[in-house]
Structure formats: structure tokens, C-alpha cells
Amino acid sequence: FMKLSLIKALYVDGLKKIYNYTEAESIFYFVLNWVEKKNKTDVILGLETLLIDTYRDILINLKNGIPVQYITNETIFYTVPLYVDENVLIPRPETEELVHWVLEEKISKTKILDIGTGSGCIALALKKRLVNTIVDGCDISDQALEIATKNAVNNNLDVTFIKLDILKDTIN
């Protein structure tokens, strides 16, 4: 067991070549919440004893360039919690802007197809807000389709994901 303040200092110092202080601190608190289910408030209140091995292993992975989302297998996209691993790209903030733009346009289409769906982030975020719209996703990768389907089930969203090579196959 080790003091939380020391682990935080190890993270901020250990990640300073990759992230600025604020980003490193945010990553530490994300890891803290993921490992211990504790948040920044718990830290302030002094709940300070943690398992060092887990934090050390995560820090080593971060220093080796593995994104925190791949380590925890979690990310949030447009308020939709998603499972991610190295078989799909981590959704970017710019992609959230795309979803926001589509929603602002108030498109009256009854069907949307997300091509190259990956984790399913776009399709799932749109379906969550456009409940009366049929949203499907396609990808060439079996692993990506498994992850997208898992994310749909975990979020209780009715999105169908199909294997499709957009350069060779026909879309119906």
C-alpha cells in the first residue's frame, strides 16, 4: 500500500515527457476512478491507501505509449460509455463534433449507415438521440464488429452491425 499523493506525483512526473501537468493529473484521476472507484473528492477527503502494483503497471503502460483508454478498455463518446481495445480506434473529440453537427442539422432521414463503424461510437451516439431512426453500422473487421455489437448491447441501443467491404460489396 502507498499514499495516494505519492502515486499521483509518480504519475505526473512519469508522464511529463508525454503529457502536460493537467493532462497527466487527469489521466491519474481517470485511473484512480477505474481501479479504486474513487474520485477527486475522495482524495481531498483523505481516502489515501491504494494498491501500488496496479498503479505501477498502468504507469509503465502509459509511459510505453499505450493510451489510457486501451489500458482500461473504456472511453466515453458523446455521453455513451464504450468498450475499446487495440482492434478499434479511440474516438476523437473531432468525431463528437461530427455527431453534434448531424444532430444540429435535424436530418429527416429514417435510416443512417455508419461506414467504418469501429467501436460503433457514431452509430450508437446517433441512435441514443434519434430513437425513431434506423441506424446501422458496417465495418470490414470482425473484431470491430464484435466490439460495436458489445457496445450496443451494453448501452441497450438497437443498432445492427454488418460486415461490409465498402470498396467491393453492394449496400442494400
State each model region's role.
Residues 38, 171-172:
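N-terminal processing/targeting junctions
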Residues 1, 21-22, 85, 112:
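A generic helix-loop boundary/linker signal
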Residues 46, 104-105, 156:
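Short, flexible coil/linker elements and helix-boundary hinge sites characteristic
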Residues 2-70:
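N-terminal auxiliary segments of SAM/dcSAM-dependent transferases
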Residues 26, 107, 157:
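Structured loop/turn residues at beta-strand edges in well-structured enzyme cores
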Residues 57-130, 135-150, 161-164, 170:
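SAM-dependent Rossmann-like transferase core, predominantly class I methyltransferases
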